[in-house]
UniProtKB/Swiss-Prot annotation:
Name of the protein this chain belongs to: Beta-galactosidase small subunit
SUPFAM superfamilies: Galactose mutarotase-like (SSF74650)
Gene: lacM
Gene3D superfamilies: 2.70.98.10
SMART domains, A to Z: Bgal_small_N (SM01038)
Species whose genome carries this gene: Latilactobacillus sakei
GO CC terms of this entry: beta-galactosidase complex
E.C. number(s) listed in UniProt: 3.2.1.23
One Pfam short name: Bgal_small_N
Example GO BP: lactose catabolic process
Reactions the enzyme catalyzes: Hydrolysis of terminal non-reducing beta-D-galactose residues in beta-D-galactosides
Length: 318
């Protein structure tokens, strides 16, 4: 790997891979199984390493047709997932995983135009399957993310499939280009394509907290935050992080709670005060149904067949 004058500095740490440019510094962890820091223009955007997500908080219709009893293993898979392997490629060339002491071979002055880090996860379902998430970082700081689910015979229907980002503080607003309002695969006909702004992180006030706030057929979404956890920034300004489709639109939800937090609450008073932003970027979403709430399943066309492969990509930029 040549030491050329490129903008992307590559730092080979003992347990992390650092990538640095003029306005950003990223850390990809070999221990947590994902990126653990995306610091852009001095602001940290990650509170937890992004991980594949498979679960949504059950809806009234889900509970009525006993979907959680049929597909409950995906809740465990959403909470606990093992990173099976990690590969690193510098300018298209795969290198031995640069953990200690392998990283001692590098000078500390390496640079590259493009770096790809791929994490392979294994679910704790029965039977098991794998998910691959690759991050390709360019010298500009743009990150292209590819998420691949490998279908496996014998697995029950999925609630959702995507990648979950947890950000350190609540978003002030988000702007997206897609369909108006809350939409699901079987609730899209009334959505009007356009650009929309949502203030704060609204949660639909159902009697029992459940999944909400999904936006289908999205071209891009920009999350804006002002508050930070860094006490050195006394007057933080609002900045945004953009997530944009690559080949096909995605779905997303942007809430102050994880699916598990919503799932555990039986009334809104049981939900904690909002402290984080939970952004789910989704390549597949189960419909909500509604034929009735006491037994009828979601129509087959709006279910997610877990035996089939799934893949979607998006770009992160600032």
């Amino acid at each position: 790997m040549a030491n050329t004058n490129k903008r992307l500095a590559v730092i080979f740490g003992d347990v992390t891979l650092g990538l640095k440019g003029p306005d950003f510094h990223y850390l990809f962890s070999y221990q947590t199984g994902g990126p653990e820091s995306l610091r852009i223009q001095g602001k940290e955007w990650l509170y937890r390493s992004p991980k594949p997500t498979f679960w949504r908080a059950t809806t009234d219709n889900d509970r009525g047709n006993q979907f959680p009893l049929k597909s409950g293993m995906w809740l465990a898979a959403d909470q606990f997932i093992a990173c099976q392997s990690i590969t690193v490629a510098i300018d298209g060339q795969t290198i031995p995983l640069p953990i200690a002491p392998e990283n001692n071979r590098y000078s500390g002055r390496e640079t590259a135009q493009e770096v790809t880090v791929t994490y392979t996860y294994q679910t704790i379902t029965t039977p098991q399957t794998t998910v691959e998430v690759s991050y390709t970082i360019q010298a500009s700081g743009k990150i292209r993310v590819a998420v691949t689910y490998h279908g496996q015979a014998g697995l029950p229907s999925l609630p959702v499939f995507g990648l979950r980002f947890v950000m350190p503080t609540p978003a002030t607003r988000f702007i997206y280009q897609g369909l108006s309002g809350e939409t699901y695969p079987d609730r899209m006909a009334g959505g009007i394509a356009g650009e929309y702004e949502v203030t704060g992180l609204p949660v639909t006030p159902y009697l029992v907290p459940q999944d909400c706030g999904v936006h289908m057929a999205t071209d891009w979404v920009t999350i804006y935050r002002q508050a930070v956890l860094d006490n050195c920034l006394h007057e933080p300004v609002e900045t945004g992080l953009k997530f944009k489709m690559v080949d096909q639109p995605f779905a997303f939800s942007c809430l102050p709670y994880t699916a598990e937090e919503l799932e555990n609450a039986t009334h809104h008073s049981e939900l904690p005060a909002p402290h984080r932003t939970v952004l789910n970027l989704l390549g597949a979403v189960r419909g909500v149904g509604g034929i009735d709430s006491w037994g009828s399943d979601v129509e087959v066309a709006y279910q997610i067949d877990a035996t089939q492969d799934r893949h979607f990509e998006f770009e992160i930029s600032f």
